[in-house]
């Protein structure tokens, strides 16, 4: 620290009580964010009783005092975090209207400060000690705080030697700070509660979509945070995110994150804070830059992950209300979502638990009047619950409804389907037989004889159109071979029968190529178990362009393995006389095979 900067800091050192004396009745007072919340200053201000004072803040570590908490002031907030919810839950606070939520994208908040729509009289922040260049780093919370310090009439700051000095655009002039309050306390730490089984499964599904060399938004929420733990086998990841959290430390140490890390604030432990301290790899910028959709969209393979609370059957997403109460806020989700959609090979993901904490279905026919839409249905691409993944972009209303019902909680799927039929969202003959989670363990990548790779996965009801497309690519001979008679069309009901299975006594596998967002089915196998005999009837379809490459054998081997694993005694199939290719497939393997010929059809029985 230069002599001048040190002298300025010492000359302006005061007690917390003296520092907050600049606050006057009727003032608008900004409170610094997240783990850099200036607790000492907040406590000192709460000791006063100044009429008309409004505290303006984003995500704070602690506002109010006591247990249950109470406050002497009105709070105008851009995010309803844990401490604000605790205040709002106090009846006297709620009835007095002391907590007001402003639904706004966080990247737009600085504009309110600069244009005077939300005038700030005082900004209370926490900073690292001044540097020789006459500036102070805002440390781990730049977010909307920098804009507040530049717009406020007066800035008062806790100066904390434990606060990291961060790179990027995190600094404010010492001259902007009217008084310094020395504190020597550890920077507040925040670790997410351990992920439960539901969040863990959602995180696994999310991680499966992320490729090497992607740029990630971490975001607030347990699922985006847990997702990071499932990326240890990825390479050359970068981060452009509103917030970074504790798992980033491990990804950097493992060499998974090797690209730049740009963020606006950090929430974690001392491990994370030590990592970002004076390290140029980690650039902290104001939120209006980090959350600018144009900046986000300039990142190649940008992945945004938005944790939602509810979604309706057409794809409208709510992120601000949970079980009838304010929770979270608009925050940065919509901006990152739009930016990721504009990114080359980008991906925008919405994730949510299938049920709310109160036990209600999070996937609903309609959003409630207290569930505002944060992301419009036209902008929703990927939706993930613990029961699977749905892709909605470019899909019809009926296709969206079916895809979302498939990943709803099994106990409500029939009810949702009936409601969708009653509303006219889907046709009256729509089928949906799945009653379990999507069997992701059965998904695998395979290589054919010519070196081409494809993915083998269980079918979904939403594969109906793609299965019809496969049917119409078959030759007349192939159709007759598969269905044992000449068939010119595959109706919606027939296609649903092939795709909509219960994953228990019924199973079907699709061999798919192309991006996950718009896969093409090039082969399929079907399995229907008879509980009476313990035998499963099987059948196959292969795209003409993919025949003769071993795909039929791969699909058959997959069904054999599935049947054995699930206790079936064997398989049966009807094959047209002369279909030598399919006969060769059945003759392979360690099993007994009996053949009965009747009416030009060979009835095959394979016992394990």
Task: Describe these PLM feature segments.
Residues 426-442:
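Intrinsic disorder at enzyme termini
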Residues 437-608:
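Long, contiguous binding/interaction regions
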């Amino acid at each position: 620290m230069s002599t001048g900067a040190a002298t300025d800091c010492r000359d302006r050192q005061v007690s917390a009580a003296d520092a907050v004396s600049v606050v006057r009745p009727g003032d608008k007072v900004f409170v610094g964010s997240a783990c850099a919340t200036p607790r000492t200053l907040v406590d000192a201000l709460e000791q006063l009783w100044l009429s008309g004072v409004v505290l303006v803040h984003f995500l704070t570590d602690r506002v109010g005092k006591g247990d249950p908490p109470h406050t002497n002031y009105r709070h105008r907030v851009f995010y309803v975090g844990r401490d604000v919810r605790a205040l709002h839950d106090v009846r006297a606070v709620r009835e007095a209207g002391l907590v007001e939520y402003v639904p706004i994208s966080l990247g737009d908040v600085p504009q309110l400060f600069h244009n005077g729509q939300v005038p700030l009289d005082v900004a209370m922040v926490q900073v690292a000690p001044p540097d020789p260049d006459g500036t102070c780093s805002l440390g781990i919370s730049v977010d909307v705080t920098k804009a507040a310090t530049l717009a406020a009439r007066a800035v008062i700051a806790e100066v904390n030697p434990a606060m990291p000095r961060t790179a990027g655009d995190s600094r404010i002039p010492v001259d902007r700070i009217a008084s310094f309050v020395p504190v020597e306390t550890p920077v507040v730490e925040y670790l997410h509660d351990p992920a439960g089984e539901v969040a863990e499964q959602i995180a696994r599904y999310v991680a499966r979509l992320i490729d090497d060399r992607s740029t990630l938004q971490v975001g607030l929420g347990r699922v985006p945070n847990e997702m990071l733990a499932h990326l240890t086998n990825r390479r050359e990841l970068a981060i452009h995110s509103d917030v970074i959290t504790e798992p980033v430390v491990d990804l950097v140490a493992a060499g998974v994150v090797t690209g730049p890390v740009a963020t606006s604030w950090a929430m974690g432990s001392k491990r994370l804070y030590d990592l970002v301290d004076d390290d140029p790899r980690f650039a902290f910028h104001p939120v209006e830059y980090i959350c600018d959709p144009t900046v986000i969209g300039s990142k190649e393979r940008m992945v945004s992950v938005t944790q939602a609370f509810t979604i309706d059957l057409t794809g409208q997403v709510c992120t601000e209300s949970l079980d009838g109460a304010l929770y979270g806020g608009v925050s940065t989700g919509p901006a990152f979502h739009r930016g990721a959609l504009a990114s080359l090979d980008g991906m925008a993901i919405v994730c949510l638990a299938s049920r709310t904490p109160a036990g209600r279905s999070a996937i609903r026919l309609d959003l409630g009047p207290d569930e505002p839409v944060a992301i419009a249905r036209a902008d929703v691409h990927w939706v993930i619950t613990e029961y699977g993944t749905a892709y909605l972009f470019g899909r019809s209303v009926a296709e969206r409804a079916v895809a979302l019902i498939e990943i709803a909680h099994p106990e409500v799927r029939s009810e949702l389907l009936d409601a969708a039929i009653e509303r006219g969202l889907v046709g009256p003959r729509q089928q949906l037989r799945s009653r379990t989670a999507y069997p992701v363990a059965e998904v695998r990548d395979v290589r054919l004889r010519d070196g081409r790779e494809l993915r083998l996965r269980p079918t979904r009801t939403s594969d109906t159109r793609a299965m019809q497309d496969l049917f119409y690519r078959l030759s007349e001979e192939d159709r007759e071979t598969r269905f044992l008679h000449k068939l010119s069309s595959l109706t919606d009901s027939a296609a649903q029968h092939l795709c909509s299975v219960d994953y228990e006594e019924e199973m079907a596998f699709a061999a798919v190529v192309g991006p996950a967002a718009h896969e093409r089915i090039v082969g399929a196998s079907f399995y229907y178990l008879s509980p009476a005999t313990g035998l499963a009837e099987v059948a196959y379809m292969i795209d003409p362009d993919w025949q003769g490459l071993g795909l039929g054998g791969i699909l058959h081997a997959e069904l054999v393995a599935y049947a054995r694993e699930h206790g079936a005694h064997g398989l049966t199939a009807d094959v047209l006389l002369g279909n030598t290719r399919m006969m060769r497939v059945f003759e392979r393997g360690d099993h007994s095979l009996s053949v009965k010929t009747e009416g030009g059809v060979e009835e095959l029985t394979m016992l394990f």
